Amino acid sequence: MSWKRNYFSGSRGSVQGMFAPRSSMSIAPSKGLSNEPGQNSCFLNSALQVLWHLDIFRRSFRQLTTHKCMGDSCIFCALKGIFNQFQCSSEKVLPSDTLRSALAKTFQDEQRFQLGIMDDAAECFENLLMRIHFHIADETKEDICTAQHCISHQKFAMTLFEQCVCSSCGATSDPLPFIQMVHYISTTALCNQAICMLEKREKPSPSMFGELLQNASTMGDLRNCPSNCGERIRIRRVLMNAPQIITIGLVWDSEHSDLAEDVIHSLGTCLKLGDLFFRVTDDRAKQSELYLVGMICYYGKHYSTFFFQTKIRKWMYFDDAHVKEIGPKWKDVVTKCIKGHYQPLLLLYADPQGTPVSAQDLPPHAQFLPYTKTCYDSEDSGHLTDSECNQKHTSKKGSLVERRRSSGRVRRKGDEPQASGYHSEGETLKEKQAPRNASKSSSSSRLKDFKETVSNMIHSRPSLASQTSAGSPCVGRAGDQLDKIPPRNFPLQARGWETESTSSEAKSSSSSKYRPTWRPKRESLNIDSIFSKDRRKHCGYTQLRTFPEDAAKEFTPDEVSKPTANDIKDGGSRSQHKLWGTARPGSHLLEQHPRLIQRMESGYESSERNSSSPVSLDAAPPDSVNVYRDQSTKRPVGFVPSWRHIPKSHSSSILEVDCTAPMTSWTKTQPLSDGEVTSRSELDELQEEVVRRAQEQELRKKREKELEAAKGFNPHPSRYMDLDELQNQGRSDGFERSLQEANSIFEESLHLEQKGDCAAALALCNEAISKLRLTLHDASSSTHSRALVDKKLQISIRKARSLQDRMQQQASSQQPVQPSASLPSQGGALPQPTSEQPITLQVLLNQEAQLEPCKDTELGATSSFFHSPASCPELHSSLIPESPVSSVSQHSPPGTSSLKLLTSFEVDSVNRSAFHRQGLPKATGRTEMNSQHECLPLDALEDRLQGHREDNSCCSKFPPREGRDIAQDQLFEGKKNPADISMGMPWSYSTGEATSERVIYSLNSPSSSSAQPSIPPYSSCHPITSAASSPVLHAADPMQKLNQHVQAQSLQTSLTSKVVRSSEEPYRLEFPSTKGLVRSLAEQFQKMQNTSTRDVIGSQDRSLPNGVRKSSSPSDFMPPLSQGPGREHCRWVKQPRSPDGRERPPCWEDPAAHPPLSMGSGLPDGETSRTAQPRLAEPDMYQGKLPQVTDIRSKELGSSVNLGTSLPLDSWVNVTRLCDSQVKPSAPGPGDKSSSHDSHPRATCLERSPILLHPHWDQDTEQETSELESLYQASLQASSHTAYSDWRSQDVAWQPLSLAGSADGMGRRLHSAPGLDLSKPLTAEMEHVLYEPSTVPVSQDSSNVRKKTLETGHHCSSSSSLPVIHDPPVFLLDPKLYPPQPQFLSPDVLMPSMAGEPYRPPGTSRSVHQFLAMCDRDETPQGVKYTGRTLNYRSLPHRSRTDASWGPGSETNQHIGARVLTMPACKPQLTYTATLPERHQGLQVPHAQSWGNLFHSPSHPSAVHPGSPPSSNLHVPLRSTWNSGPVLGSRTPGPRRIDMPPDDDWRQSSYPSQDRHRSPGEERIMFALSNAAGREQNRVRFLQHSRW
């Protein structure tokens, strides 16, 4: 309000000036009051703070030494104790438990202020005052309490007269005397009047505040003319005393009213009593100015207090135990209230010159006999008395406002019953003293006493009356004259008053136009009364209804039926009352609810009833008056507080006239009332009715609370909307409208989805998401609304993901499957998870031959990559929507990733054709691929995975790198336990499609990881192979051995890396699968297209390379054989669990197992690697290798995402993908199978990428990931061409290009570049991939990948399942899924699926080498000695800016560019430490020790053509561990770390290689080293093509 400033400015200084600081002893430092959870004592604490800080009360209370003690329910004693603590305690926070307990016991019968139950602060304040009155005053003599030492009545109570005077006919209603502790005003009326005043006055002034309050208190409270002349007149209130503290209670229509800010602005800090009431009879009151010193506020079911600390002259804020200094100015409070949305509830205006009460008249202590509890019940609140009952009823009704009113209802005293009731709690004492039975007589006697006292008051103040009525001839007249003839000047004054108040009336009427703004929207929090609709119509503001229809009905008949002794004005008044009563009941009846009995502001209702009462005080005999009022009030009072009768304002003339009349009438009435049995019986009935109704209200309250609790928060959320939102009511409507629209759109989307129109459903779902996001902004101010919208938004997002997954799956299923149908089908078929649930899975991104290292070094490499066909089929099944589940379940550790895949993809979406291809039954939706492989919830999947890990012996954890690898693996299987195989969780491919790579899933159980390491990779990896396949495999084995020996170092390096990584990383990388990013279908399709393009190229390359690869690396080629039926058999064979009961991913096997991998790489433990689960490690190695290859292949892929380029440090997925891609090439299958396997590698890559996806994967990361993925796939292609080399866990030699021949992913890519369909040299493609902007759709973005990585294998599986992957074979997690394929990496880059898994576009098949994706946080698999290395920017492949070899022509370099990716073993936050050797240096192992073998040669594989022999693969000695030695490399001591920003923009031509030494524990090597049969040749070619 514009005039608020005037108020504040005028009063601000005066407040400070008037209140002189007290002595330090006067008030102790401010202390807080405790409010423990569940106590809900904030309302009491607020009232206590107000009482303590009111100087007048504190000083007066200090003087009181005697009281009527009530024992443990004595509020006076409790209050004394707390005040003493306030004064003397050194504690900053004091307990209020004693007072809370006493309060609860005092009002136990009324069920008010009970322990643990929130109540109303204003009512509590009022009742405390009344309790004090009862304790220190003689109630029998003080119905109106004239005791000088009664703080409540001497300092707080307002003695008022209320009367209506008709300006037309001069008729007057009987004056209604009453006392109120709190003057209640409707906030709605206040705001309406403020608007009216502003409209009428140009310059508002602080003096307007009093007038504003007066107009607001009577606004809309129009009465029918007492003589029923048809006029509507306003109540007049006259203040007869001079209270030093005025308490203004603001009645709110809702807990979260939109008027809060307006009300705060409209508050003035200075209040003149003369302005507050129509007339003031006390001279002191006329001159007194009170200043705002305290304010109790409410917000969010919590009360707090602002108080002006006179000692420091600053406003303080008390919030239970918290005390805060606000500032010296009121505006500081206003600012805080507005920011906090506080609703002022109680305003305390105090006279700065106020004095404490006089204690001279204190009765001796002996006079105060303690009341026994038996006599004293909580009813003493006065509710049980005539008026008390009314009050009690109202209070019981639960409306806090009612309680406040009841204290204000002291006015009820004005109503006979109110006599006692005005002390809302007061009369109970009296009643208790007298038996309840006697309550009739006592109540009647009290009524008589009250009337007498009132009449005496009136008589004793004739001068006051005369003063007020200046010139009124009737001042001295007898009541009879008054009864018969109102003074002439009275009507005139009335007219004048009407004229004065017309403005307010007009305002009220005119304010109706503002009603919409002020109309309360919600159930009132503190208000017991509701604005009646009728009043709204008439007055322009909603009036509080005090009584229900019954009450109204009762009231009308009572009034009608009750004959009045004097009918002089009776007829008119009676008829009036009838009319008024009926009209009123209508208004009140509207929405009347007993619990909703609302406190009228300052007795709107009571005044109405009084005015409407048929008998005027003069005309009606006191008895009749009592009867009428009691009945009319009482019955209504049952629902309506007696304060309905409370007079609101009287003109001075009225007072004069009424003074005598009331005296006479009251005197007449007294005897009658004494003798009247009827009145007593009525009182009793009224009490009973009140009690009954109060109980009903309590029951209703309880039911409502129960309903609210059942609904979770609030059945009417709008009630709890924030003030900001309420202040913008239009916005709330918009919010609801938007929410409804979003809901309808979402429902339509569901409908379309049911019809099968996923695209349209997704579009609508996205639209709903957009609307919900907008709505979320609108609901930002409402916690409840925000939660509601957020919930719906999450549901919509999940649905969008589901739809995208389905579409991707459909697309994948539609895409042609590679020759190794099982792989592609698996990859494509992998259902995309409707929603990804975080599951920690350790996944060898791809498994070729099982990683179990062959005891023989040469076999070791092969065997480590070797995976039985059975495992492949299982892998395939896992890849398939159901199969992923099964594979996951089967491969418990790897299963994690598979679970992730499952999570990512819906089994439904799995390509069923893939199942058929795999020889697996086509499973619909989430049907089991294998009996073992059911689609289960992630938890179930984990269990399954663990279970299936055992079962999936066939699903060896290591995909056969190549036919030879598979053969070796099979051989090793023979050597090793199938349990080992079962440990391995490679995805099975269809028969003949043994994936060269297997994905090892490790559920998030360290045991599985540890167990897996212990299990020989061979057994875990080797699937049961058909005799033919196994012979082939065996046959392949020798070749593989040779190639492996050649490539052993590289493969071992890669495998070792894998093993190391896997060993370091428990299989069960427990990565919470991040929810797959919901990507637009466009993005998905983009990825698919990009991936498919790359895959097509890659698959072409791969397919060519497969043959070529076979030729180039016989061992690699051998795996394709294993991919054959034998592999299929392996696929179906269940791998026994590791001793842990978990399948060990081959990677996790001991370094000994990995040494076979190190054959080619030169790992001393190549054989051991084979023996161990090198395959498990191998997939990792492959993945690592794949990254190496991927760099090459990425470039080669060109279109493929530049995983390496854009991959953020934490983008595990990309690294994994790179590794997978490399791995896939490492395990070339026979001929086309390889290419199909390539697609499988793609799937593997998908699996891989999810494996390491970081939970916090973001789109930037995704972009980087996609770039890295491109590189990775390129390297994968190259690595897929190269045979997987066994690698020891210790000797995780990072062999970017040390892929032998086509066996190396890089080699494969190289091969594919020259001889494969790849049009670009691998280097070029890799370079393109590396440098090209991430072509992968956003879904493939590194962020997605990263997130997927955190999800670990799950996402990988999911992404493989993503329909985006046209080539189902692309399964990041399970190399098994991919039959051994040529090492040529398909140009396609694995793309992150919506599920978060990378996938290759359909059509690009590539065998994926097993890659164990490990997070830094994951534990190292037990028994695995591999040092882990975190993938980082340096560790990831990049090309040095200076290296021109990275150009498209430098395939070899590109292959080399794919660098070993080291991944922290099991840490969810995956850090990729991909070390990228300088181009000129070729791939370099971070440490000579770890890389020594891997990098025997410059690690620069010569560009390998698709037809190039395995020798083309780079050979990198594995002897050096990541941490053990500097990376070989002319340019940089070691490979570059991707996790660290390169010195130069690594996306540009150069990658400064920085060797970063990581402790094995800190990082896991995530690179797959491919066998390097022709590693030297590859190295030479690579060196030729690239200059590191």
UniProtKB/Swiss-Prot annotation:
EC number(s) from the headed UniProt entry: 3.4.19.12
Residues that hold Zn(2+) 1 according to the record: H67, C69, C74, C77
MF GO annotations: cysteine-type deubiquitinase activity; K63-linked deubiquitinase activity
Keyword terms: Coiled coil, Hydrolase, Metal-binding, Methylation, Phosphoprotein, Protease, Thiol protease, Ubl conjugation pathway, Zinc
CDD domains listed in its UniProt record: Peptidase_C19
Top-level EC class as recorded in UniProt: hydrolase
Binding-site positions, Zn(2+) 3: C166, C169, C225, C229
UniProt binding sites for Zn(2+) 2: H133, C145, C150, H153
GO biological process: protein deubiquitination; proteolysis
The keyword Zinc is assigned to this record: yes
Listed Low complexity bias regions: 499-513, 601-616, 808-826
InterPro entries reported in the protein's UniProt record: Inactive_ubiquitin_hydrolase, Papain-like_cys_pep_sf, Peptidase_C19_UCH, USP_dom
Coiled-coil residue windows: 682-712
Catalytic site: C42, H302
Residues annotated with Phosphoserine modification: S424, S613, S616, S1138
Catalytic activity, as annotated: Thiol-dependent hydrolysis of ester, thioester, amide, peptide and isopeptide bonds formed by the C-terminal Gly of ubiquitin (a 76-residue protein attached to proteins as an intracellular targeting signal)
Record carries keyword Secreted: no
Described function: Deubiquitinase that specifically mediates 'Lys-63'-linked deubiquitination of substrates with a polyubiquitin chain composed of at least 3 ubiquitins. Specifically recognizes ubiquitin chain in position S2 and catalyzes cleavage of polyubiquitin within 'Lys-63'-linked chains. Not able to deubiquitinate substrates with shorter ubiquitin chains. Mediates deubiquitination of PLK4, maintaining PLK4 stability by reducing its ubiquitination-mediated degradation.
Family: Belongs to the peptidase C19 family.
PANTHER family for this protein: INACTIVE UBIQUITIN CARBOXYL-TERMINAL HYDROLASE 54, UBIQUITIN SPECIFIC PROTEINASE
This protein's name: Ubiquitin carboxyl-terminal hydrolase 54
Organism: Mus musculus
